[in-house]
Every structure is written in structure tokens, then in C-alpha cells.
Amino acid sequence: MMLITTSHRPTRRTRSFGHDLERVFPNSLYLTRGKKTIQELLMEAYDRGYERLLILNVWKGNPLKMTFIKVHPEDWGYLGYLYLHGIKLQREMGFKGLNPIREDMPLVVTTAKRVGWDHIAFAQVFAELTTGKFVPRGDKSLTYIADKYDTDVIAVIERHPRGMVINFYRLDVTKDRPVGPLINVKIWIMEDGRRWDYKEALGIKVPRREKGEGQESSSENRD
């Protein structure tokens, strides 16, 4: 599915976040960044058969941004960015030591049952960024969806006062509650121009980002 790493000099919390994502993205791997460049990471991801490279960018000790990159030896490119309000790690949700999923199964992306069009649009975007499968929720239970698509892991887009959140369920662990990590998204930007900002959604005027501004200008956060 994807190779997961961080910007240079990550904090312990950001590394823990990367390991948590490895446990909910099927057949994915968290890799310590070290001194590797973007090009070296892309080649490693390609050699391992991954379609995506995910870089977790840090700001003031916490994960600030998730950068998704298409993996291809000749046609790689930035796909999109999630700007975060905050995260909650698996251990903070009562789950420690979960095993990564080392078998082929889809990451199903859906929504809570009563959400707006913004949440549905983001669920489709998140599926695109992760190579997951978007499934409209309707009145279906998560167990029904998991059984139908033969998977143990579902990402659910839910409401939040400051944006929206991604909650991960591992039905092989528990069918009663999410295992984490919980990701609070305040802005998402796609390279093709699609975007969403929770302040704009609330009618708060904010400076408009120019095309390509989603990419970091500093070498530490870009790389």
C-alpha cells in the first residue's frame, strides 16, 4: 500500500504516529528516515512495490501535515496534503502493541451515518490519497461493510467542531470502538486544485493559498 516516513529530525510522538499508521494501513511499512532524500525514499518505495509514499511533517514537536506522493520511477508527483489540528495515538485510546496487517486487504474508507457533503467528499479524497476503497455508508454497519469487502480495517470520516476527524477501526481487534490513531484534519489540499478549509466552511475569511503552496518551502519540512 504505502511507505510511511517522516521529515528529518522527527519527534518521538511523530515516530509513534508513523508506527500507528503502519498498523492500520494494510501491507504498509514505517521506515526511519535518516538522511534519505525524497528520491531515495521514492526508489525504496518502488522497489518494495508500494504505490504511495507518505511523509509526516513536524511542527513544534507535533505532526502538522501528511504529504502523499505518487510512487513511479519516471512519473512520481505530489498528490495532496492533510493539515492537522492534532492526533490521538493508539496507546492514548487504550490500544498498545497492535500487529501490522501483513496480508492483502483493502483499506475501506467511509463516513459516519449522518454527515454532510464535505465529509463524503473528503472520504473520497482520502481513499484516493491512500489507494483505499471509498464505500458510501448509508445505513450499513461497519461489520457489514467489512464482511462485504473482505477487510479488517475501516477508516471512518466523522464530524468535529474544528474540521473533521479520521477514526480507524480494526475489526480483528474489536468491533466495538476505534483503535486509533484519531486524526483531526483542518485543511486538505489536492494538487489538482480541490481543497477544503474548516474556517472557510464556517464562513470565516482566510487568505487563499496559491496553487502549489501545499508543498513546504523549507528543506526540512519538504524533505
Curated annotation (Swiss-Prot):
One biological process term in Gene Ontology: rRNA processing
InterPro entries the record matches: Brix, Brix_dom_Rbsml_bgen_prot
Keywords: Ribosome biogenesis
Domain (Brix): residue spans on this chain: 1-196
Chain ranges passing through the membrane: none
GO molecular function, one term: rRNA binding
HAMAP family: BriX
Function: Probably involved in the biogenesis of the ribosome.
The protein's name in its UniProt record: Probable Brix domain-containing ribosomal biogenesis protein
Source organism of this protein record: Pyrococcus furiosus (strain ATCC 43587 / DSM 3638 / JCM 8422 / Vc1)
Lineage of source species: Archaea, Methanobacteriati, Methanobacteriota, Thermococci, Thermococcales
